[in-house]
Amino acid sequence: MTTNRSAPSATIVPILVYEDVGKALEFLSRAFGFKERLRAEWGGAISHAQMDIGSGSIMMGKQGGPFRVSSGDTVSQYAHVHVDDVDRHFERAKAEGATILKTPEDMPFGVRQYTAKDIGGHWWTFSQNIRDVDPVEWGARVADR
């Protein structure tokens, strides 16, 4: 595979739409700990940006054409991000103005997690592994490979 400094190296990179990409860059950095990778300005405004967190990446684009910011209280997708300390992450997100949808909770599949909404209406679940759990314990079946 050819390396390209203009593109994230992650295998899957979601692209999220925001009304104001610059404000989204600032918010995701402050509230969720993302690190800016690059930004592109066209017509005097940031229209594209990339951010990293851990080994993952996201791209962001400005609303326009068929791409619209989510409206309402339902979503068809959300991002799940693993962090080292979910309680500390939760406190940071809350202090920086993230809308908390679900407070930290221990889940039967071995993670502690919370869910928040960002300034663009995107939902994010942040989790921390707290114990190793056999998937069968919580009702999952491991696929044959």
Label each PLM-derived region with a short phrase.
Residues 120:
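C-terminal catalytic core of tyrosine-transesterase DNA break-rejoin enzymes
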Residues 1-15, 25-117, 126-145:
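Vicinal oxygen chelate
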Residues 18-22:
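Short acidic-aromatic low-complexity motifs
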